[in-house]
């Protein structure tokens, strides 16, 4: 019985299947190393793992796998130490600003104020300004000319800064920035950082600044005096995100603050206006102006579930009659001079007397007509009775 076992121990290392199984018993850190020499193979066959495998191949393979598992973290090979992909941490929210800039109008010593071009509300318009709302309606990445008017020329080195803030009080501490979708699109960025909302078009001296304390974005350009034949300076701004973008403004109204500053950053003038970036500026301007005229204030946007069409109160198709003006109201009239006062007093008394006589005459005529109607009814009934009496004997 011992001879077959000895023969088996000699024949097993020479077979290909046995060699492949033994190759799997090697530690992971030696898989990519050079092939072992004949001496190392002899040592391998004399090891305890090989002896156990010869007795019971299944248990030996399980034991070798269990032994190789704790040794894997200690291996220094970069292939064996490749970590599993870790889920990316959620993006941290944008920090809130420590201060809210003022947006109150301040003309200063130089009479600083803003102006806009006159434009209609057609569908083809890309930028339009509403004076009654003090609101600019524009399309995404379209030119928005803003005029700067001053009563006297500012000192050399004066700069113009544009900054956007949220209009509503509960959002004022948040920094206005583009949505993630528009941040990833590098179209039209140029020198501007991708998260900046306001850009300046056609000015190579524009500086895009991020305040380290307030975290707010602004764009600064040097002030240029008006050209010959012009009374104002025009700066062309672009807004690079829609007001309805999720993750950005998210339908929250914003204000653009334009400030005039000296080289040291001191304020020389300030003005602001509301901005809405939308697909159809003309239509939105007409809608908001109508709501403003009806209610005296901008109509708040209704949530999607409550946006129902209001039914008219009067469903009848007949036109309503016009209400007559009432003459029972009293008015006070200031008259200079006593003579004029007496003249108007006599005129007023005469008109009052005329109205009283007309009222009395209408009452008398109404009573007389009712009396005639009653008399006429009585005479008709008497005539019928007489005719019946006269016809009575003839019928008999």
UniProtKB/Swiss-Prot annotation:
Chain coiled-coil ranges: none
Region (Oligomerization): 328-359
Residue segments, region Interaction with HIPK1: 103-373
Cofactor binding mode and count: Binds 1 zinc ion per subunit.
Modifications after synthesis and translation: Phosphorylation on Ser residues mediates transcriptional activation. Phosphorylation at Ser-9 by HIPK4 increases repression activity on BIRC5 promoter. Phosphorylated on Thr-18 by VRK1, which may prevent the interaction with MDM2. Phosphorylated on Ser-20 by CHEK2 in response to DNA damage, which prevents ubiquitination by MDM2. Phosphorylated on Ser-20 by PLK3 in response to reactive oxygen species (ROS), promoting p53/TP53-mediated apoptosis. Phosphorylated on Ser-33 by CDK7 in a CAK complex in response to DNA damage. Phosphorylated by HIPK1. Monomethylated at Lys-375 by SETD7, leading to stabilization and increased transcriptional activation. Monomethylated at Lys-373 by SMYD2, leading to decreased DNA-binding activity and subsequent transcriptional regulation activity. Lys-375 monomethylation prevents interaction with SMYD2 and subsequent monomethylation at Lys-373. Dimethylated at Lys-376 by EHMT1 and EHMT2. Monomethylated at Lys-385 by KMT5A, promoting interaction with L3MBTL1 and leading to repress transcriptional activity.
A single MF term (Gene Ontology): promoter-specific chromatin binding
Region of interest (Interaction with CCAR2), ranges: 1-323
Region (Disordered): 62-99, 286-325, 360-396
Region (Basic (repression of DNA-binding)): 371-390
Residues modified to Symmetric dimethylarginine: 340
Record's compositionally biased regions (Polar residues): 367-381
Region annotation Required for interaction with FBXO42: where it falls in the sequence: 116-239
Positions bearing N6,N6-dimethyllysine: 373, 376, 385
Region of interest called Interaction with HIPK2, as start-end residue ranges on this chain: 322-363
Implicated disorder: p53 is found in increased amounts in a wide variety of transformed cells. p53 is frequently mutated or inactivated in many types of cancer.
Domain comment quoted from the record: The N-terminal and C-terminal disordered regions undergo liquid-liquid phase separation (LLPS) following homotetramerization and activation. Post-translational modifications, such as phosphorylation or lactylation affect the ability to undergo LLPS.
Family designation: Belongs to the p53 family.
Protein name: Cellular tumor antigen p53
Classification lineage: Eukaryota, Metazoa, Chordata, Craniata, Vertebrata
Gene: TP53
